[in-house]
Swiss-Prot record:
Membrane topology: Peripheral membrane protein
EC numbers on record: 7.6.2.-
Protein name: Lipoprotein-releasing system ATP-binding protein LolD
GO cellular component, one term: plasma membrane
SUPFAM superfamilies recorded: P-loop containing nucleoside triphosphate hydrolases (SSF52540)
UniProt domain ABC transporter: residue ranges: 13-235
Species of the source: Blochmanniella floridana
Pfam families linked to this entry: ABC_tran
InterPro entries attached to this UniProt entry: AAA+_ATPase, ABC_transporter-like_ATP-bd, ABC_transporter-like_CS, MacB-like_ATP-bd, P-loop_NTPase
Complexes and interactors: The complex is composed of two ATP-binding proteins (LolD) and two transmembrane proteins (LolC and LolE).
GO MF, one example: ATP binding
Family classification: Belongs to the ABC transporter superfamily. Lipoprotein translocase (TC 3.A.1.125) family.
Main location: membrane
Binding positions (ATP): G49, A50, S51, G52, S53, G54, K55, S56
Length: 235
């Protein structure tokens, strides 16, 4: 029998020399200027940086929502940026969950339906999707909200529902863009505790772009984006 060393496990996500340039009518800017990084399984990683430094751009490229100008992103060993739009979208739906600052819940659907939505998009029957969504809601202690609509939720509740929706497919990777950006300290702590629980229960890897330094300090590792480059923080 071959004993696998923990160091033999490949990273869940690798960025290799990512460059991203935006071209405007008479000039261009280089937002990311050669980002190389590896993210290990089961970690909670923070990406911090000044406003406009490129955190969201990097997260979008990591999730296949945007393509780099050059360089590669490998998700579980597959070059995401080289996949066709169709294959990239399949990989996104199966392997990545997304959480946004303003949660992006669908206003005309109940909490339960919002959480079930990624499964319905995948083609699961409503009864099965509903059952799974109920299970997740119970697991994270939000079952009392299942019939409410997004306009009937507080900011913290909305964000926890968005977390539930991001993990319903049990993706190995969740990318979160300012997940606590519009929340007060107590709600922000609650959302982070939820991410920590999910990380422990399922081994989900989280990459969080944030301005919130106290949240970043609770993560396993902090990267700083500055002048298009990335460095590991020693804070
Ligand atoms: N689709 C786009 N087209 C052109 N320029 C863009 C686009 N998206 C972002 N930018 C520019 O790229 C730079 C980085 O933006 P990005 O949103 O990644 O920064 P950020 O660090 O996430 O900022 P914030 O913390 O304010 O959300 C900014 O100068 C922004 O204006």
């Amino acid at each position: 029998m071959v004993n696998k060393n923990i160091n033999d496990i490949p990273p869940i996500l690798c960025c290799s020399n990512i460059i991203k340039r935006y071209q405007y009518s008479n000039f261009s800017i280089t937002v990311l200027d050669g980002i190389t990084m590896s993210i290990e399984y089961n970690k909670i990683i923070a990406i911090i940086g000044a406003s406009g430094s490129g955190k969201s751009t990097l997260l979008h490229i990591m999730g296949g929502l945007d393509k780099p100008t050059s360089g590669d992103v490998f998700l579980e060993g597959r070059a995401l940026n080289k996949l066709s739009d169709k294959d990239c979208s399949i990989m996104r739906n199966t392997s990545i969950g997304f959480i946004y600052q303003f949660h992006h819940l669908l206003p005309d659907f109940s909490v339960l339906e919002n959480i079930a939505m990624p499964l319905l998009i995948k083609g699961l029957k409503f009864a099965i999707a509903k059952h799974k969504a109920q299970f997740i809601l119970e697991l994270i202690g939000l079952n009392n909200l299942c019939d409410r609509y997004p306009c009937e939720l507080s900011g913290g509740e909305s964000q926890r529902v968005a977390v539930a929706r991001a993990i319903i497919n049990n993706p190995p990777l969740v990318l979160a863009d300012e997940p606590t950006g519009n929340l007060d300290e107590s709600n922000s702590n609650n959302v982070f505790k939820l991410l920590e629980k999910i990380n422990l229960w399922y081994g989900t890897t989280f990459v969080i772009a944030t301005h919130d330094l106290s949240l970043a300090k609770k993560c396993h590792k902090i990267y700083i984006v500055s002048n298009g480059m990335l460095k590991i923080s020693t804070i």
